A protein has these predicted regions:
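Conserved class I S-adenosyl-L-methionine
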Residues: 3-15
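Conserved SAM-binding loop of SAM-dependent methyltransferases across substrates and taxa
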Residues: 13-26
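Short beta-strand element of Class I
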Residues: 28-32
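Conserved SAM/SAH-binding beta-strand->alpha-helix loop
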Residues: 35-36
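S-adenosyl-L-methionine
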Residues: 45-105
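Mobile active-site "lid"/loop adjacent to the S-adenosyl-L-methionine
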Residues: 85-90, 95-103, 119-155
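A conserved beta-strand element that flanks and buttresses the S-adenosyl-L-methionine
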Residues: 112
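A structural motif corresponding to the C-terminal end of an alpha-helix
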Residues: 152-169
């Protein structure tokens, strides 16, 4: 029996914009997201077994809700220096974490990534918008958010290259 290629979908979430059922006869899936409940719900919705569809959080860019909530509390009275310094600390903390991909080195034949890099730090940007903060008036914070996005995209690409043996889409 021929082995089906393994397709990893990075930032899969609930797969609301994907039709896994259409590809299921031809491939095996690995759904990657930091919210396990979402990717498990997607697998269940499509009626895929664990052999057909593995759900995993590779933890390559770990920012926790507590850090996001603390940033939200800073927004009330925090100035540009304090906001940017906090984001720098978060970024350094994440950068110090060395993700391990034990068991996943070159495990995927193909990786599919759409817009994930921009989502990795999106909550911080969303909070600034929610609180009516103008990034033009917060140049240090804007610069730090840009640097966080560069770091997140780099970490994502490193993870993809370690785990993918074939093409990246």
């Amino acid at each position: 029996m021929e082995e089906k290629p393994v397709v990893a979908i990075w930032g899969a979430g609930r797969c609301n914009d994907l039709d896994l059922e259409m590809l299921a006869p031809y491939v095996r899936f690995v759904l990657i997201d930091r919210t396990m409940e979402d990717i498990q719900a997607a697998r269940a919705r499509y009626g895929l077994s664990e052999a057909q569809c593995v759900c995993v959080d590779l933890r390559f860019w770990e920012i926790y809700e507590e850090e996001e909530r603390f940033f939200e509390t800073l927004l009330a009275n925090g100035d540009d220096l304090h906001l940017s310094e906090y984001l720098r600390q978060v970024m350094e903390s994440v950068a110090e974490q060395q993700p391990t991909f034990a068991g996943y080195e070159k495990a995927f034949d193909f990786s599919v990534v759409c817009g994930l890099a921009s989502q990795l730090n999106a909550r911080f940007a969303g909070l600034l918008q929610l609180y009516g903060k103008d990034l033009r008036r917060l140049p240090r914070t804007a610069a730090m958010m840009k640097e966080m996005n560069v770091q997140a995209a780099g970490r994502l690409m490193d993870a993809i290259m370690v785990t993918t043996s074939g093409a990246v889409f």
